[in-house]
Amino acid sequence: MAAFVAMLGLIDPALRTAGFGAFAIAAASAAAARRRGAGAVVVVLALASAGFVIAAAVRPEFRADTRGYYVYLRSIAFDHDLDFANEWTAWGLPAAPLTATGLRHNPFPVGPALFWFPFFAIAHLYVLITHALGLRPWAPDGYDLPYLNALAAGSISAVTAGGCLLVRSMAGYLTLRQAAIVVTGAILTSSIAYYTFVVPGMAHALTFALACFLVWAWHEAERAPTLRSWSLLGLSVGLVALTRWQGLVVGLLPAALAVQQLRQRAVRPRWIAAAAGAGLLAFLPQVVVWKLLFGRWLTMPQGPGYVDWSSPHLADVLFSADHGFFDWTPVMLAGTLGLLLLLPSMPTFAGASLAVVAATAWVNGGVRDWAANDAFAARRFDLAVPFVAWGLAALGRVATVGLRRRPWTVVAAVLGAFAIWNVGFIRLYRARAFTDAAPFERLAAAQARQLYRVLDSGAARRGPRARSFVHGFMVGEYFHDNVNPFGTIDVGALDSPWLADGWSAPELREGWPAFRWALYPRACVLVPLLEPRALRSSIRVRAPARIPEQSMRILSNGAVVATVPVAREWADVAFTVPAENLVRGENQVCFEFGRSLPGEANGSNAAAVALIRLP
Protein backbone atom coordinates (compact mmCIF):
# COMPACT_ATOMS: atom_id res chain seq x y z
CA MET A 1 0.00 0.00 0.00
CA ALA A 2 2.82 2.42 0.85
CA ALA A 3 4.49 1.76 -2.51
CA PHE A 4 1.18 2.44 -4.27
CA VAL A 5 0.80 5.81 -2.51
CA ALA A 6 4.40 6.65 -3.39
CA MET A 7 3.56 5.89 -7.01
CA LEU A 8 0.52 8.18 -6.84
CA GLY A 9 2.85 10.88 -5.51
CA LEU A 10 4.72 10.57 -8.80
CA ILE A 11 1.63 10.34 -11.01
CA ASP A 12 0.05 13.46 -9.47
CA PRO A 13 2.55 16.14 -8.33
CA ALA A 14 -0.02 17.43 -5.82
CA LEU A 15 0.51 14.20 -3.84
CA ARG A 16 4.30 14.48 -3.76
CA THR A 17 4.44 15.06 0.00
CA ALA A 18 2.22 12.04 0.61
CA GLY A 19 4.53 10.06 -1.65
CA PHE A 20 7.56 10.96 0.47
CA GLY A 21 5.72 9.89 3.60
CA ALA A 22 4.71 6.62 1.96
CA PHE A 23 8.32 5.95 1.03
CA ALA A 24 9.38 6.46 4.66
CA ILE A 25 6.77 3.89 5.72
CA ALA A 26 7.86 1.47 2.99
CA ALA A 27 11.52 1.81 3.98
CA ALA A 28 10.75 1.24 7.67
CA SER A 29 8.59 -1.78 6.81
CA ALA A 30 11.35 -3.23 4.65
CA ALA A 31 13.94 -2.79 7.39
CA ALA A 32 11.67 -4.47 9.94
CA ALA A 33 10.84 -7.30 7.55
CA ARG A 34 14.50 -7.97 6.83
CA ARG A 35 15.24 -8.18 10.54
CA ARG A 36 12.53 -10.84 10.80
CA GLY A 37 14.04 -12.69 7.85
CA ALA A 38 11.07 -11.98 5.58
CA GLY A 39 11.19 -12.37 1.80
CA ALA A 40 12.59 -9.94 -0.73
CA VAL A 41 9.26 -8.62 -2.04
CA VAL A 42 8.96 -5.96 0.66
CA VAL A 43 12.50 -4.76 -0.14
CA VAL A 44 11.71 -4.54 -3.85
CA LEU A 45 8.61 -2.47 -3.07
CA ALA A 46 10.66 -0.16 -0.85
CA LEU A 47 13.23 0.28 -3.63
CA ALA A 48 10.47 1.06 -6.12
CA SER A 49 9.05 3.60 -3.65
CA ALA A 50 12.46 5.24 -3.45
CA GLY A 51 12.52 5.45 -7.24
CA PHE A 52 9.07 7.03 -7.31
CA VAL A 53 9.99 9.80 -4.86
CA ILE A 54 13.30 10.45 -6.65
CA ALA A 55 11.48 10.85 -9.95
CA ALA A 56 8.85 13.07 -8.32
CA ALA A 57 11.62 15.32 -7.02
CA VAL A 58 13.48 15.28 -10.35
CA ARG A 59 10.28 15.99 -12.33
CA PRO A 60 10.50 13.83 -15.44
CA GLU A 61 10.65 15.38 -18.88
CA PHE A 62 8.74 14.05 -21.87
CA ARG A 63 10.93 15.03 -24.76
CA ALA A 64 12.94 13.56 -27.62
CA ASP A 65 11.22 10.38 -28.89
CA THR A 66 8.78 10.04 -25.99
CA ARG A 67 5.69 10.86 -28.04
CA GLY A 68 6.60 8.26 -30.65
CA TYR A 69 6.57 5.55 -27.98
CA TYR A 70 3.57 6.85 -26.06
CA VAL A 71 1.31 7.42 -29.05
CA TYR A 72 0.67 3.67 -29.39
CA LEU A 73 -0.67 3.55 -25.85
CA ARG A 74 -2.89 6.58 -26.17
CA SER A 75 -4.24 5.65 -29.61
CA ILE A 76 -5.00 2.02 -28.75
CA ALA A 77 -6.54 2.85 -25.36
CA PHE A 78 -8.74 5.77 -26.45
CA ASP A 79 -9.21 5.43 -30.22
CA HIS A 80 -8.83 1.65 -30.52
CA ASP A 81 -6.71 2.05 -33.65
CA LEU A 82 -3.23 2.87 -34.92
CA ASP A 83 -4.20 6.12 -36.64
CA PHE A 84 -2.01 8.71 -34.92
CA ALA A 85 -3.19 11.79 -36.85
CA ASN A 86 -5.28 13.19 -33.98
CA GLU A 87 -2.43 12.75 -31.48
CA TRP A 88 0.05 14.67 -33.65
CA THR A 89 -2.56 17.43 -34.06
CA ALA A 90 -3.24 17.57 -30.31
CA TRP A 91 0.49 17.90 -29.62
CA GLY A 92 0.86 20.63 -32.23
CA LEU A 93 3.27 18.56 -34.31
CA PRO A 94 3.36 18.32 -38.09
CA ALA A 95 1.59 15.25 -39.40
CA ALA A 96 3.84 12.28 -40.08
CA PRO A 97 3.84 10.99 -43.67
CA LEU A 98 1.40 8.28 -44.68
CA THR A 99 2.53 4.68 -45.00
CA ALA A 100 1.49 2.14 -47.62
CA THR A 101 -1.56 1.28 -45.50
CA GLY A 102 -2.72 4.90 -45.25
CA LEU A 103 -1.75 5.30 -41.59
CA ARG A 104 0.72 7.75 -40.09
CA HIS A 105 4.33 6.63 -40.05
CA ASN A 106 5.84 5.71 -36.67
CA PRO A 107 9.29 4.09 -36.60
CA PHE A 108 9.26 3.35 -32.87
CA PRO A 109 8.54 -0.09 -31.39
CA VAL A 110 5.26 -0.96 -29.72
CA GLY A 111 6.83 -2.91 -26.85
CA PRO A 112 7.26 -0.06 -24.35
CA ALA A 113 3.57 0.87 -24.67
CA LEU A 114 2.58 -2.69 -23.79
CA PHE A 115 4.81 -2.70 -20.70
CA TRP A 116 3.52 0.68 -19.55
CA PHE A 117 -0.14 -0.26 -19.98
CA PRO A 118 -0.85 -1.35 -16.34
CA PHE A 119 0.52 1.94 -15.01
CA PHE A 120 -1.34 3.89 -17.68
CA ALA A 121 -4.55 2.13 -16.58
CA ILE A 122 -3.93 3.11 -12.95
CA ALA A 123 -3.38 6.73 -13.99
CA HIS A 124 -6.55 6.68 -16.08
CA LEU A 125 -8.60 5.31 -13.19
CA TYR A 126 -7.13 7.97 -10.89
CA VAL A 127 -7.96 10.73 -13.39
CA LEU A 128 -11.50 9.42 -13.87
CA ILE A 129 -12.19 9.40 -10.12
CA THR A 130 -10.64 12.77 -9.33
CA HIS A 131 -12.25 14.36 -12.39
CA ALA A 132 -15.70 13.03 -11.47
CA LEU A 133 -15.30 14.34 -7.92
CA GLY A 134 -13.96 17.70 -9.10
CA LEU A 135 -10.78 17.24 -7.06
CA ARG A 136 -8.16 17.67 -9.77
CA PRO A 137 -8.05 19.57 -13.08
CA TRP A 138 -6.95 16.59 -15.19
CA ALA A 139 -9.09 15.60 -18.19
CA PRO A 140 -9.52 11.85 -18.83
CA ASP A 141 -8.28 12.09 -22.40
CA GLY A 142 -4.81 10.55 -22.26
CA TYR A 143 -2.93 13.82 -22.70
CA ASP A 144 -2.62 15.24 -19.19
CA LEU A 145 0.36 14.94 -16.87
CA PRO A 146 -0.75 11.87 -14.83
CA TYR A 147 -0.76 9.75 -17.97
CA LEU A 148 2.78 10.81 -18.83
CA ASN A 149 4.02 10.37 -15.28
CA ALA A 150 2.59 6.85 -15.38
CA LEU A 151 5.32 6.05 -17.92
CA ALA A 152 7.88 7.06 -15.30
CA ALA A 153 6.22 4.77 -12.75
CA GLY A 154 6.37 1.90 -15.23
CA SER A 155 10.01 2.46 -16.15
CA ILE A 156 11.07 2.78 -12.50
CA SER A 157 9.22 -0.40 -11.58
CA ALA A 158 10.86 -2.25 -14.46
CA VAL A 159 14.37 -1.05 -13.59
CA THR A 160 13.82 -1.97 -9.93
CA ALA A 161 12.66 -5.48 -10.80
CA GLY A 162 15.36 -5.90 -13.44
CA GLY A 163 18.08 -4.69 -11.10
CA CYS A 164 16.96 -7.18 -8.44
CA LEU A 165 17.07 -10.02 -10.99
CA LEU A 166 20.56 -8.93 -12.01
CA VAL A 167 21.61 -9.03 -8.36
CA ARG A 168 20.16 -12.54 -8.06
CA SER A 169 22.08 -13.63 -11.15
CA MET A 170 25.31 -12.88 -9.25
CA ALA A 171 24.43 -15.18 -6.33
CA GLY A 172 27.32 -17.52 -5.76
CA TYR A 173 29.77 -15.09 -7.32
CA LEU A 174 29.18 -12.15 -4.97
CA THR A 175 27.32 -11.71 -1.72
CA LEU A 176 23.95 -9.98 -1.84
CA ARG A 177 25.45 -6.74 -0.54
CA GLN A 178 28.34 -6.82 -3.00
CA ALA A 179 26.05 -7.51 -5.94
CA ALA A 180 23.72 -4.69 -4.87
CA ILE A 181 26.68 -2.29 -4.82
CA VAL A 182 27.74 -3.32 -8.32
CA VAL A 183 24.27 -3.19 -9.89
CA THR A 184 23.37 0.12 -8.26
CA GLY A 185 26.71 1.50 -9.39
CA ALA A 186 26.15 0.34 -12.98
CA ILE A 187 22.75 2.05 -13.09
CA LEU A 188 23.89 5.33 -11.53
CA THR A 189 27.09 5.63 -13.60
CA SER A 190 25.41 4.97 -16.95
CA SER A 191 22.73 6.54 -19.11
CA ILE A 192 20.15 4.28 -17.42
CA ALA A 193 19.85 6.75 -14.53
CA TYR A 194 18.85 9.50 -16.96
CA TYR A 195 16.34 7.35 -18.84
CA THR A 196 14.83 6.02 -15.62
CA PHE A 197 14.29 9.29 -13.76
CA VAL A 198 14.64 12.19 -16.20
CA VAL A 199 13.28 10.95 -19.56
CA PRO A 200 11.51 7.71 -18.63
CA GLY A 201 9.12 7.77 -21.59
CA MET A 202 11.61 6.16 -23.96
CA ALA A 203 12.53 2.51 -24.36
CA HIS A 204 15.95 2.54 -22.70
CA ALA A 205 15.01 1.87 -19.08
CA LEU A 206 12.75 -0.99 -20.16
CA THR A 207 15.40 -2.43 -22.47
CA PHE A 208 17.89 -2.42 -19.62
CA ALA A 209 15.40 -4.11 -17.30
CA LEU A 210 14.58 -6.84 -19.82
CA ALA A 211 18.28 -7.38 -20.53
CA CYS A 212 18.67 -7.94 -16.77
CA PHE A 213 15.87 -10.52 -17.01
CA LEU A 214 17.79 -12.15 -19.86
CA VAL A 215 21.02 -12.36 -17.84
CA TRP A 216 19.16 -13.89 -14.89
CA ALA A 217 17.35 -16.37 -17.18
CA TRP A 218 20.65 -17.32 -18.81
CA HIS A 219 22.22 -18.19 -15.46
CA GLU A 220 19.12 -20.17 -14.49
CA ALA A 221 19.28 -22.14 -17.74
CA GLU A 222 23.03 -22.63 -17.35
CA ARG A 223 22.68 -23.82 -13.74
CA ALA A 224 19.64 -26.05 -14.22
CA PRO A 225 18.67 -26.59 -17.87
CA THR A 226 14.99 -27.50 -18.17
CA LEU A 227 12.17 -26.82 -20.59
CA ARG A 228 10.98 -24.04 -18.27
CA SER A 229 14.36 -22.34 -17.86
CA TRP A 230 15.06 -22.44 -21.58
CA SER A 231 11.59 -21.14 -22.41
CA LEU A 232 12.15 -18.20 -20.05
CA LEU A 233 15.48 -17.54 -21.73
CA GLY A 234 13.90 -17.47 -25.18
CA LEU A 235 11.06 -15.30 -23.90
CA SER A 236 13.56 -12.78 -22.54
CA VAL A 237 15.25 -12.44 -25.94
CA GLY A 238 11.92 -11.75 -27.61
CA LEU A 239 10.96 -9.17 -25.00
CA VAL A 240 14.25 -7.29 -25.39
CA ALA A 241 13.70 -7.19 -29.16
CA LEU A 242 10.11 -6.06 -28.61
CA THR A 243 11.31 -2.92 -26.84
CA ARG A 244 14.06 -2.20 -29.40
CA TRP A 245 14.55 -4.36 -32.48
CA GLN A 246 18.33 -3.79 -32.27
CA GLY A 247 18.10 -5.86 -29.08
CA LEU A 248 18.10 -9.01 -31.20
CA VAL A 249 21.87 -9.07 -30.70
CA VAL A 250 21.29 -10.45 -27.18
CA GLY A 251 20.42 -13.71 -28.93
CA LEU A 252 24.17 -14.34 -29.03
CA LEU A 253 24.01 -15.21 -25.33
CA PRO A 254 21.54 -18.13 -25.51
CA ALA A 255 23.16 -19.24 -28.78
CA ALA A 256 26.49 -19.67 -26.99
CA LEU A 257 24.81 -21.55 -24.15
CA ALA A 258 23.01 -23.81 -26.62
CA VAL A 259 26.29 -24.77 -28.27
CA GLN A 260 27.89 -25.47 -24.88
CA GLN A 261 25.03 -27.55 -23.52
CA LEU A 262 24.49 -29.47 -26.76
CA ARG A 263 28.13 -30.53 -26.57
CA GLN A 264 27.64 -31.53 -22.94
CA ARG A 265 24.31 -33.23 -23.77
CA ALA A 266 22.78 -31.11 -21.00
CA VAL A 267 19.96 -29.68 -23.13
CA ARG A 268 17.39 -31.26 -25.38
CA PRO A 269 16.90 -29.82 -28.87
CA ARG A 270 13.17 -29.42 -28.24
CA TRP A 271 13.97 -27.15 -25.29
CA ILE A 272 15.95 -24.90 -27.61
CA ALA A 273 13.07 -25.03 -30.09
CA ALA A 274 10.68 -24.05 -27.30
CA ALA A 275 12.96 -21.13 -26.44
CA ALA A 276 12.92 -19.97 -30.06
CA GLY A 277 9.14 -20.28 -30.12
CA ALA A 278 8.77 -18.28 -26.91
CA GLY A 279 10.99 -15.56 -28.33
CA LEU A 280 9.00 -15.36 -31.55
CA LEU A 281 5.74 -15.28 -29.59
CA ALA A 282 7.03 -12.39 -27.46
CA PHE A 283 8.06 -10.48 -30.59
CA LEU A 284 4.74 -11.16 -32.36
CA PRO A 285 3.02 -7.86 -31.32
CA GLN A 286 5.71 -5.89 -33.14
CA VAL A 287 5.29 -8.00 -36.27
CA VAL A 288 1.53 -7.40 -36.21
CA VAL A 289 2.00 -3.65 -35.76
CA TRP A 290 4.46 -3.51 -38.66
CA LYS A 291 1.95 -5.33 -40.85
CA LEU A 292 -0.84 -2.90 -39.91
CA LEU A 293 1.32 0.21 -40.26
CA PHE A 294 3.60 -0.62 -43.17
CA GLY A 295 1.88 -3.54 -44.88
CA ARG A 296 4.82 -5.85 -44.18
CA TRP A 297 5.40 -8.47 -41.52
CA LEU A 298 9.09 -7.52 -41.30
CA THR A 299 10.51 -4.13 -42.20
CA MET A 300 13.13 -1.52 -41.40
CA PRO A 301 10.74 1.10 -39.97
CA GLN A 302 13.30 3.91 -40.19
CA GLY A 303 13.56 3.36 -43.94
CA PRO A 304 16.17 1.90 -46.30
CA GLY A 305 19.74 2.94 -45.64
CA TYR A 306 19.14 3.60 -41.94
CA VAL A 307 21.94 1.18 -41.02
CA ASP A 308 25.25 0.91 -42.86
CA TRP A 309 26.32 -2.59 -41.90
CA SER A 310 30.00 -1.73 -42.45
CA SER A 311 29.72 0.31 -39.21
CA PRO A 312 31.75 3.36 -40.28
CA HIS A 313 31.34 5.00 -36.86
CA LEU A 314 32.27 2.03 -34.68
CA ALA A 315 35.11 3.88 -32.92
CA ASP A 316 33.00 7.03 -32.56
CA VAL A 317 30.11 5.39 -30.71
CA LEU A 318 32.61 4.08 -28.18
CA PHE A 319 35.21 6.81 -27.75
CA SER A 320 33.95 10.08 -29.24
CA ALA A 321 33.31 13.08 -27.01
CA ASP A 322 30.08 13.30 -28.99
CA HIS A 323 28.04 10.76 -26.96
CA GLY A 324 30.68 8.01 -26.93
CA PHE A 325 29.75 5.09 -24.65
CA PHE A 326 33.12 5.00 -22.89
CA ASP A 327 33.69 8.77 -23.10
CA TRP A 328 30.45 10.00 -21.50
CA THR A 329 30.21 7.10 -19.04
CA PRO A 330 33.79 5.92 -18.33
CA VAL A 331 32.76 3.28 -15.77
CA MET A 332 31.28 1.38 -18.72
CA LEU A 333 34.80 1.00 -20.13
CA ALA A 334 36.02 -0.42 -16.81
CA GLY A 335 33.13 -2.88 -16.73
CA THR A 336 33.65 -3.97 -20.32
CA LEU A 337 37.32 -4.66 -19.63
CA GLY A 338 36.26 -6.43 -16.44
CA LEU A 339 34.48 -9.04 -18.55
CA LEU A 340 37.93 -10.21 -19.64
CA LEU A 341 38.59 -11.20 -16.02
CA LEU A 342 35.58 -13.55 -16.19
CA LEU A 343 36.90 -15.51 -19.16
CA PRO A 344 38.89 -18.09 -17.14
CA SER A 345 36.06 -18.96 -14.74
CA MET A 346 32.98 -18.26 -16.92
CA PRO A 347 34.21 -18.51 -20.52
CA THR A 348 30.84 -18.99 -22.21
CA PHE A 349 29.06 -16.18 -20.39
CA ALA A 350 31.98 -13.74 -20.53
CA GLY A 351 32.74 -14.47 -24.18
CA ALA A 352 29.10 -14.15 -25.23
CA SER A 353 28.70 -10.97 -23.15
CA LEU A 354 31.68 -9.40 -24.88
CA ALA A 355 30.17 -10.46 -28.20
CA VAL A 356 26.87 -8.77 -27.29
CA VAL A 357 28.65 -5.53 -26.36
CA ALA A 358 30.70 -5.69 -29.57
CA ALA A 359 27.64 -6.43 -31.72
CA THR A 360 25.77 -3.56 -30.09
CA ALA A 361 28.65 -1.23 -30.88
CA TRP A 362 28.78 -2.51 -34.47
CA VAL A 363 25.07 -1.90 -35.07
CA ASN A 364 25.15 1.50 -33.37
CA GLY A 365 28.20 2.48 -35.40
CA GLY A 366 26.26 1.88 -38.59
CA VAL A 367 23.14 3.85 -37.70
CA ARG A 368 22.60 7.00 -39.74
CA ASP A 369 22.39 9.26 -36.67
CA TRP A 370 25.07 7.34 -34.79
CA ALA A 371 25.36 9.97 -32.01
CA ALA A 372 21.56 9.87 -31.46
CA ASN A 373 19.70 13.17 -31.43
CA ASP A 374 18.71 14.71 -28.09
CA ALA A 375 20.41 11.94 -26.13
CA PHE A 376 22.25 11.79 -22.86
CA ALA A 377 25.35 9.62 -23.33
CA ALA A 378 25.25 6.57 -25.62
CA ARG A 379 21.63 5.67 -24.96
CA ARG A 380 21.56 2.86 -27.52
CA PHE A 381 23.93 0.81 -25.34
CA ASP A 382 21.11 0.32 -22.82
CA LEU A 383 21.06 -3.46 -23.27
CA ALA A 384 24.84 -3.67 -22.74
CA VAL A 385 24.75 -2.23 -19.21
CA PRO A 386 23.76 -5.51 -17.42
CA PHE A 387 26.73 -7.25 -19.04
CA VAL A 388 28.99 -4.38 -18.04
CA ALA A 389 27.68 -4.78 -14.48
CA TRP A 390 28.99 -8.33 -14.49
CA GLY A 391 32.36 -6.98 -15.61
CA LEU A 392 32.29 -4.55 -12.70
CA ALA A 393 31.56 -7.49 -10.40
CA ALA A 394 34.68 -9.27 -11.63
CA LEU A 395 36.71 -6.09 -11.34
CA GLY A 396 35.45 -5.54 -7.81
CA ARG A 397 36.45 -9.03 -6.73
CA VAL A 398 39.96 -8.63 -8.08
CA ALA A 399 40.38 -5.10 -6.70
CA THR A 400 39.40 -6.10 -3.17
CA VAL A 401 41.83 -9.02 -2.85
CA GLY A 402 44.51 -6.89 -1.20
CA LEU A 403 42.12 -4.88 0.98
CA ARG A 404 41.60 -6.24 4.50
CA ARG A 405 39.18 -3.81 6.13
CA ARG A 406 35.82 -3.12 4.48
CA PRO A 407 37.10 -3.78 0.96
CA TRP A 408 33.70 -3.37 -0.68
CA THR A 409 33.25 -0.03 1.04
CA VAL A 410 36.11 1.15 -1.16
CA VAL A 411 34.35 -0.21 -4.25
CA ALA A 412 31.13 1.53 -3.20
CA ALA A 413 33.02 4.79 -2.64
CA VAL A 414 34.63 4.67 -6.09
CA LEU A 415 31.34 3.89 -7.81
CA GLY A 416 29.66 6.55 -5.68
CA ALA A 417 32.16 9.16 -6.83
CA PHE A 418 31.53 8.29 -10.48
CA ALA A 419 27.78 8.31 -9.80
CA ILE A 420 28.05 11.86 -8.44
CA TRP A 421 29.99 12.82 -11.58
CA ASN A 422 27.24 11.26 -13.73
CA VAL A 423 24.47 13.03 -11.82
CA GLY A 424 26.32 16.31 -12.27
CA PHE A 425 26.70 15.58 -15.97
CA ILE A 426 22.97 14.87 -16.21
CA ARG A 427 22.23 18.19 -14.53
CA LEU A 428 24.47 20.00 -17.02
CA TYR A 429 22.79 18.18 -19.89
CA ARG A 430 19.33 19.15 -18.65
CA ALA A 431 20.52 22.77 -18.48
CA ARG A 432 21.70 22.39 -22.12
CA ALA A 433 25.28 23.21 -21.17
CA PHE A 434 26.25 20.19 -23.27
CA THR A 435 24.01 18.78 -25.97
CA ASP A 436 26.33 17.23 -28.55
CA ALA A 437 30.06 16.98 -27.91
CA ALA A 438 31.24 17.24 -24.30
CA PRO A 439 34.96 18.11 -24.40
CA PHE A 440 36.52 16.83 -21.20
CA GLU A 441 38.26 20.11 -20.38
CA ARG A 442 34.99 22.05 -20.53
CA LEU A 443 33.04 19.30 -18.79
CA ALA A 444 35.52 19.11 -15.91
CA ALA A 445 35.39 22.89 -15.51
CA ALA A 446 31.58 22.84 -15.52
CA GLN A 447 31.53 20.03 -12.96
CA ALA A 448 33.94 21.93 -10.72
CA ARG A 449 31.70 24.97 -11.07
CA GLN A 450 28.70 22.91 -9.97
CA LEU A 451 30.62 21.58 -6.98
CA TYR A 452 31.51 25.12 -6.01
CA ARG A 453 27.85 26.12 -6.28
CA VAL A 454 26.81 23.30 -3.96
CA LEU A 455 29.49 24.17 -1.40
CA ASP A 456 28.71 27.87 -1.68
CA SER A 457 25.01 27.23 -1.15
CA GLY A 458 25.77 25.27 2.00
CA ALA A 459 28.23 27.88 3.24
CA ALA A 460 25.68 30.66 2.69
CA ARG A 461 23.61 29.19 5.52
CA ARG A 462 26.57 29.59 7.86
CA GLY A 463 27.29 33.22 7.04
CA PRO A 464 29.70 35.43 5.05
CA ARG A 465 32.86 33.97 6.58
CA ALA A 466 31.99 30.46 5.48
CA ARG A 467 31.20 31.67 1.96
CA SER A 468 34.46 33.59 1.82
CA PHE A 469 36.38 30.48 2.90
CA VAL A 470 34.70 28.32 0.24
CA HIS A 471 35.43 30.89 -2.47
CA GLY A 472 39.04 31.17 -1.39
CA PHE A 473 39.43 27.37 -1.39
CA MET A 474 37.60 26.62 -4.65
CA VAL A 475 38.37 29.76 -6.69
CA GLY A 476 40.72 32.24 -5.01
CA GLU A 477 40.38 34.89 -7.75
CA TYR A 478 39.29 38.46 -6.99
CA PHE A 479 38.59 41.49 -9.16
CA HIS A 480 41.04 44.37 -8.68
CA ASP A 481 43.48 42.04 -6.87
CA ASN A 482 44.85 38.99 -8.69
CA VAL A 483 42.54 38.91 -11.73
CA ASN A 484 40.75 41.48 -13.91
CA PRO A 485 42.41 44.52 -12.30
CA PHE A 486 40.02 47.02 -13.97
CA GLY A 487 36.83 45.03 -13.32
CA THR A 488 35.90 44.97 -17.02
CA ILE A 489 33.68 42.21 -18.41
CA ASP A 490 33.81 41.93 -22.20
CA VAL A 491 30.37 40.42 -22.71
CA GLY A 492 30.86 39.90 -26.44
CA ALA A 493 34.06 37.87 -26.07
CA LEU A 494 34.03 34.25 -27.18
CA ASP A 495 35.01 33.04 -23.72
CA SER A 496 34.01 35.28 -20.84
CA PRO A 497 34.44 33.48 -17.49
CA TRP A 498 32.44 36.06 -15.55
CA LEU A 499 29.12 35.45 -17.29
CA ALA A 500 26.53 33.50 -15.31
CA ASP A 501 23.07 32.51 -16.54
CA GLY A 502 20.90 34.33 -19.05
CA TRP A 503 23.15 35.09 -22.03
CA SER A 504 23.04 34.12 -25.69
CA ALA A 505 26.06 33.10 -27.73
CA PRO A 506 28.26 36.05 -28.85
CA GLU A 507 27.18 37.85 -32.02
CA LEU A 508 28.68 40.30 -34.52
CA ARG A 509 26.65 42.84 -36.53
CA GLU A 510 27.84 45.52 -38.89
CA GLY A 511 28.37 48.78 -37.02
CA TRP A 512 27.84 47.15 -33.62
CA PRO A 513 30.45 46.13 -31.05
CA ALA A 514 30.72 42.43 -30.28
CA PHE A 515 27.81 41.63 -27.96
CA ARG A 516 25.51 39.03 -26.48
CA TRP A 517 21.79 39.15 -25.98
CA ALA A 518 20.69 39.39 -22.38
CA LEU A 519 17.82 36.94 -22.25
CA TYR A 520 14.47 37.69 -20.66
CA PRO A 521 13.86 37.96 -17.78
CA ARG A 522 17.35 38.09 -16.29
CA ALA A 523 21.05 37.91 -17.17
CA CYS A 524 23.79 37.84 -14.53
CA VAL A 525 27.54 38.30 -14.13
CA LEU A 526 29.89 37.13 -11.39
CA VAL A 527 31.94 39.66 -9.43
CA PRO A 528 34.47 38.12 -7.00
CA LEU A 529 35.80 40.65 -4.48
CA LEU A 530 38.48 40.39 -1.82
CA GLU A 531 36.84 43.19 0.18
CA PRO A 532 33.40 44.71 -0.50
CA ARG A 533 33.42 48.37 -1.55
CA ALA A 534 31.12 50.61 -3.56
CA LEU A 535 31.44 50.01 -7.31
CA ARG A 536 30.69 52.98 -9.60
CA SER A 537 29.81 50.96 -12.64
CA SER A 538 28.39 51.12 -16.15
CA ILE A 539 26.87 48.80 -18.74
CA ARG A 540 27.03 49.34 -22.52
CA VAL A 541 23.58 48.29 -23.63
CA ARG A 542 20.84 48.87 -26.19
CA ALA A 543 17.27 47.65 -26.49
CA PRO A 544 16.04 45.91 -29.64
CA ALA A 545 14.58 48.37 -32.14
CA ARG A 546 11.17 46.69 -31.95
CA ILE A 547 10.84 47.23 -28.19
CA PRO A 548 9.68 50.83 -27.80
CA GLU A 549 10.16 51.12 -24.03
CA GLN A 550 12.55 48.79 -22.25
CA SER A 551 13.37 48.99 -18.55
CA MET A 552 16.19 47.35 -16.63
CA ARG A 553 16.44 46.61 -12.92
CA ILE A 554 19.94 46.08 -11.58
CA LEU A 555 20.35 43.77 -8.60
CA SER A 556 23.35 42.86 -6.48
CA ASN A 557 23.01 39.57 -4.61
CA GLY A 558 19.23 39.84 -4.96
CA ALA A 559 18.91 43.46 -3.74
CA VAL A 560 17.72 46.11 -6.21
CA VAL A 561 20.32 48.87 -6.59
CA ALA A 562 18.90 50.75 -9.61
CA THR A 563 16.10 50.84 -12.17
CA VAL A 564 16.93 52.53 -15.47
CA PRO A 565 15.44 52.88 -18.97
CA VAL A 566 17.25 51.27 -21.90
CA ALA A 567 17.48 53.24 -25.15
CA ARG A 568 17.29 51.75 -28.64
CA GLU A 569 20.79 53.00 -29.43
CA TRP A 570 24.07 51.98 -27.80
CA ALA A 571 24.67 53.88 -24.57
CA ASP A 572 26.76 53.51 -21.42
CA VAL A 573 24.30 53.39 -18.52
CA ALA A 574 25.91 54.31 -15.19
CA PHE A 575 24.93 52.79 -11.86
CA THR A 576 26.47 52.29 -8.42
CA VAL A 577 26.54 49.07 -6.44
CA PRO A 578 26.69 50.03 -2.72
CA ALA A 579 29.22 48.26 -0.52
CA GLU A 580 26.45 47.01 1.77
CA ASN A 581 25.05 44.97 -1.14
CA LEU A 582 28.36 43.18 -1.72
CA VAL A 583 30.18 40.44 0.16
CA ARG A 584 33.69 39.09 0.40
CA GLY A 585 33.98 36.33 -2.21
CA GLU A 586 31.64 35.83 -5.14
CA ASN A 587 28.84 38.30 -5.86
CA GLN A 588 26.17 38.08 -8.51
CA VAL A 589 25.07 41.24 -10.30
CA CYS A 590 21.94 40.71 -12.38
CA PHE A 591 20.06 42.73 -14.98
CA GLU A 592 16.29 42.18 -15.10
CA PHE A 593 14.24 43.38 -18.05
CA GLY A 594 10.60 44.33 -18.33
CA ARG A 595 10.00 43.08 -21.88
CA SER A 596 11.47 40.63 -24.39
CA LEU A 597 11.71 40.29 -28.14
CA PRO A 598 11.39 36.84 -29.66
CA GLY A 599 14.65 36.13 -31.45
CA GLU A 600 15.70 33.69 -34.13
CA ALA A 601 17.26 31.17 -31.77
CA ASN A 602 16.13 31.55 -28.18
CA GLY A 603 12.88 33.49 -28.34
CA SER A 604 13.65 35.77 -25.38
CA ASN A 605 16.05 38.56 -26.39
CA ALA A 606 15.69 41.50 -23.99
CA ALA A 607 18.73 43.72 -24.66
CA ALA A 608 22.09 43.67 -26.41
CA VAL A 609 25.04 44.06 -24.02
CA ALA A 610 28.64 44.65 -25.10
CA LEU A 611 30.56 45.71 -22.00
CA ILE A 612 30.18 45.92 -18.22
CA ARG A 613 32.60 47.96 -16.12
CA LEU A 614 32.83 47.45 -12.35
CA PRO A 615 36.01 49.45 -11.47
Regions found by a protein language model. Give the residues of each.
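Membrane-proximal envelope and lipid/glycan-remodeling enzymes
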Residues: M1-G487, V491-A493, G502, E507-E510
